[in-house]
Amino acid sequence: MYARRKYDLKKILYVDIDAHHGDGVFYEFEHDPDLIIADIHEDGSFLYPGTGFESETGSGAAKGTKLNLPLSPGATDRDFISAFTKIEDFIESMKFELIIFQCGADGLSGDPLTHLKYSDKSHEYAAQVLHRIAHEKSGGRIIGLGGGGYNTENLATAWNKVVEVFASENLT
């Protein structure tokens, strides 16, 4: 991984809130204990790629360093925030030097390809929590990456919220 080589980092936290399970990242790093993965997505029983079940927690030395939180179709901000608190609990005792936040916006209500019903408040909440955690645990190092989102208005609104939070000095 580029960030490891370039900046001599050992442990990285990757948080993915795209509606689709991040199967490419998950399965590439399934055996890697130095990439902690937390992924909230629509249940794979209802949405492509059909992966990301709670029982998938990593393998070998990486067992327990991966967290999949599939949500039922129709999940709202309340469901998202409840799941996100599980991420907070999951990473509480872990050490990492960088957070990578994949902030796909296809979980927002009105997306034509998914069945989740979040508002931009979910993105804002996730960004606030990760921003605070980055300053507490990884020297403020956090990267926000775009992801899926097939309603352009939702996409712009959600990503704007993330940028606003990351640019602020408020760590609530």
Residue locations for each model-derived region?
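Conserved alpha-helical scaffold segments that buttress catalytic/binding sites
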Residues: 1-136, 163-167
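Rossmann-like dinucleotide/flavin-binding elements
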Residues: 144
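C-terminal active-site-proximal or functional interface alpha/beta core segments in diverse enzymes
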Residues: 150-172
